[in-house]
Amino acid sequence: TKKDVLPGEIFWSDEAELEIPKNHYLCFEITFSGSEIPFTPDKIVPAFSLDENGFKEDKEFPQPIFVGIRVSKSKKVVFIGDSITQGLGTTPDKYEFWAARLAERLGKNFSFWNLGLGCGHAYDAVTDGSWLKKAKTGDTVFVCFGVNDINMHRSVTGICNDTERIVYLLKSAGCKVILLSVPPFDMVGEDKKKWYAVNDFLRNTVSKNADGFFDVSDIIGKPSPRRHMSLYGPHPDG
């Protein structure tokens, strides 16, 4: 099968019926041609590229972002945010991916799509491009941005406006939105001040437009007045 893909286009393969024995792997081969093809290396699925010397382990090419199965009457839950949302560094040198753990606990009545992306920013998602369009396919969307926006020295107003707009775009698409506070990240100086200012706005203003609000620091932050610091180190997934 061959398909020409336009810039920014999202495409899906045709449905196929497969029977995979327990403890076996599904392998498939895809050929891309063109120039400046975007990709993200943040995946743990084994991936290989083929050249004149044979197959070699390689993540620097486009890979399927979603492999789904049809489940009747399941609620679709989406997580969008950065690497904290994605579930990297859950404990030292360990990637546990919260969406996968929740899927195991909640069973077949729920399906999860982990759209957390390393170094993700609110200003990326607010462009309403392919990333946010994927999130709009969910019934419930958890939104957690801010750490990378602050680390990139963006203004408090810019971060707050972008987050508020993201909530609006998702709600307009018919999604229920659960807004998360900016997680603790051991920030200092001006970044620390921005962390408190952004979280105050999210808690007191943006949360009123969402269907729920979860303050991450209640679970993984240190006691006040050090709520901006994580109990589990600088990448606070623990």
Segments predicted by a language model, with ranges:
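N-terminal secretory targeting modules
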Residues: 1-80, 85-92, 108, 136-137, ...
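Conserved SGNH/GDSL esterase-like catalytic core that processes O-acyl groups on lipids
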Residues: 11, 15, 73-168, 186-200, ...
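A cross-domain feature marking catalytic cores of carbohydrate-active enzymes
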Residues: 30, 145, 181-182
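Class I S-adenosyl-L-methionine
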Residues: 103, 171, 203-207
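Proline-centered loop/turn at the N-terminus of a beta-strand
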Residues: 111, 176-178, 212
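Residue-level recognition of beta-strand->loop/alpha-helix junctions
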Residues: 114-116, 181, 215
